[in-house]
């Protein structure tokens, strides 16, 4: 789950990190009032969306009067911002962040992520701030510094100091960098963070370090123990189908193909997508209904798949271990009747009560295509999607 910049900076402030004074507003008048609270003669206004590249798309602007703040807010609120990280539809802008200006002498990068290979949190820093870190990693990987956090002893000040020296910091800057490093590490652990980026972490003209941006991603699997963070979720920034699926505890990821897939188990779901590809099809989604799927969840999963207009056929691939195939069959029948399915549906059932499940489907009177094997299912659904 991603947070907006203003939300990330609120958390930074709670953990003692230096951030600009700023307030988020959802109206043009609110944006002007935010500037009044901040004071001064110059401000930065930023569209709040879950995507990078806002500046190049016109979503970040330096303004010198409140009329420009009002005009910026009126122009963007309620519209979609399209950047190189969004699709052609962009992301809806429902809030504008108004901040005080910062005089910048230099830009750095500081981030932290879970390295699944080493199974540790890894901090990364670079002198190439304000640039996409992926670009730096590809073109000049030697400019990225790394520090692994030992889960037993935790983050150590010496790791921050080594990084600070390598970044060319000196004097009080090293102490400030160490405080930021340790604050981020504490926040990462306590809030179940999956990703943090400060890009750029700037050196101001007065020599002090300052967090000019905040990108924070929370581990969605840990939200049950982070109620405060769960309340920060902005469903408008997510794929509508994915957000709907999450409410039903369904693991759904939208793709760009035309074969809808409903499977129980993440591994089987990926294998199903692979075999659909192998036979010339393109999956429209990843959808894992889970081992404890109920009839209601299966019906809801069907609705979510069919809400994608690109879907020309649906493949249901169920291995009955914990879940019973006859229950899945009843869910399929219920969904087909309720939604009014107009595309071919191919079903492959194996495992617990598979024979009973196939019997339930056969006696339903619905035009459902039965498959004897996974290969057979893939061939049939690809052919059906092509109208053969």
Swiss-Prot record:
User: Which Pfam families does the record associate with it?
Assistant: ATP-grasp_2, Ligase_CoA
Annotated residues that bind substrate are located at 264, 321-323
Keywords attached to this Swiss-Prot or TrEMBL record, sorted alphabetically, are: ATP-binding, Ligase, Magnesium, Metal-binding, Nucleotide-binding, Tricarboxylic acid cycle
Q: Which residues are Mg(2+)-binding?
A: 199, 213
The record's Gene Ontology cellular component field reads:
cytosol; succinate-CoA ligase complex
Cofactor requirements of the protein = Mg(2+)
Q: Name one GO biological process term.
A: succinyl-CoA metabolic process
Q: Where are the transmembrane segments?
A: none
Q: Which reaction does it catalyse?
A: succinate + ATP + CoA = succinyl-CoA + ADP + phosphate; GTP + succinate + CoA = succinyl-CoA + GDP + phosphate
Which leading EC class covers this enzyme? ligase
Q: How is the cofactor bound?
A: Binds 1 Mg(2+) ion per subunit.
Q: How does it assemble?
A: Heterotetramer of two alpha and two beta subunits.
Q: Which family does it belong to?
A: Belongs to the succinate/malate CoA ligase beta subunit family.
Record protein name field: Succinate--CoA ligase [ADP-forming] subunit beta
The organism named in the record is: Alteromonas mediterranea (strain DSM 17117 / CIP 110805 / LMG 28347 / Deep ecotype)
């Amino acid at each position: 789950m991603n947070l907006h910049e203003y939300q990330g900076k609120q958390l930074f402030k709670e953990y003692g990190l230096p951030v600009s004074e700023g307030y988020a507003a959802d109206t043009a008048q609110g944006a002007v009032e935010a500037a009044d609270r901040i004071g001064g003669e110059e401000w930065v206004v930023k569209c709040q969306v879950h995507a990078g590249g806002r500046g190049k798309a016109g979503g970040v602007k330096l303004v010198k009067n409140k009329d420009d703040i009002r005009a910026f807010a009126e122009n963007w609120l309620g519209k979609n911002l399209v950047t190189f990280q969004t699709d052609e539809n962009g992301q809806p802008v429902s809030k504008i962040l108004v901040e005080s200006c910062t005089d910048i002498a230099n830009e750095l990068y500081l981030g932290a992520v879970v390295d699944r290979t080493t199974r540790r949190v890894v901090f990364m820093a670079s002198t190439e701030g304000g640039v996409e870190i992926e670009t730096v990693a590809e073109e000049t990987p030697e400019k990225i510094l790394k520090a692994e956090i030992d889960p037993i002893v935790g983050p150590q000040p010496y790791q921050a100091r080594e990084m600070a020296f390598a970044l060319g910091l000196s004097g009080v800057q090293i102490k400030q960098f160490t405080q930021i490093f340790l604050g981020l590490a504490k926040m990462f652990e306590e809030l179940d963070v999956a990703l943090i980026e400060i890009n750029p972490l700037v050196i101001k003209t007065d020599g002090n370090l300052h967090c000019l941006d905040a990108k924070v991603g929370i581990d969605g699997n840990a939200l049950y123990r982070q109620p405060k963070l769960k309340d920060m979720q902005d469903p408008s920034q997510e794929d509508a189908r994915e957000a709907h699926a999450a409410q039903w505890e369904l693991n759904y990821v939208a793709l760009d193909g035309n074969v809808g897939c409903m499977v129980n188990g993440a591994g089987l779901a990926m294998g199903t997508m692979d075999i659909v590809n192998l036979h010339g099809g393109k999956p429209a989604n990843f959808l894992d209904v889970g081992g404890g799927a109920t009839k209601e969840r299966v019906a809801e999963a069907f609705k979510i798949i069919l809400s994608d207009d690109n879907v020309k056929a649906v493949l249901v691939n169920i291995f009955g271990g914990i879940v019973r195939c006859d229950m899945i069959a009843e869910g399929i029948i219920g969904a087909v009747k309720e939604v009014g399915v107009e595309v071919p549906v191919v079903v492959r059932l194996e495992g617990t009560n598979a024979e009973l499940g196939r019997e339930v489907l056969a006696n339903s009177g619905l035009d459902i295509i039965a498959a004897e094997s996974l290969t057979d299912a893939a061939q049939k659904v690809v052919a059906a999607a092509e109208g053969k």
